[in-house]
Amino acid sequence: QLSSLQGAENYLLVFWSTGCSHCLREIPELYKFLKDTQKIKVIAFSMEENAVRWEQMKKDFPHWHHALGLGKWENKTAKTYSIYSTPSYFVLDKNKKIIEKPALFEDLKIILEQL
């Protein structure tokens, strides 16, 4: 799915979960922060045990591309990216190569402002 996205200067891959209190605070703030930019496309990969809460919550972020990873921590994609905590952020260039992996939300905002 990531390979099919086109047309952005940068991409932001966000691993999150509807059961994560940090995610529930940061993800809406991130959405507001990026709302008016066209140069960054967001891929929100939600790691869940089931799709019920995710189906409802993804509607709050209509401009993002959404993907569901059932199995939460055991999900193949989460394991591929070595996700051990949520939220986890990966900033990608236009060729979808990882250029930054900030640990803190404040660091992410600084990186995104500089793109």
Placement of each model-derived feature along the sequence:
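A cross-kingdom marker for long, charged
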Residues: 7-10, 63, 76
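Short active-site neighborhood of thiol/selenol oxidoreductases, capturing the structured segment around
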Residues: 2-24, 30
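Active-site lining segments that contact anionic ligands and/or coordinate catalytic metals
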Residues: 7-10, 40-42, 86-87, 105
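Short, hinge-like loop/turn segments at secondary-structure boundaries
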Residues: 60-62, 85
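Short hydrophobic segments within beta-strands
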Residues: 15-16, 45, 92
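Structural microenvironment flanking redox-active thiols in thiol-disulfide oxidoreductases
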Residues: 24-60, 73-78
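Thiol/disulfide oxidoreductase modules built on the thioredoxin-like
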Residues: 72-113
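Short hydrophobic/aromatic-enriched beta-strand-loop microsegments
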Residues: 64-69
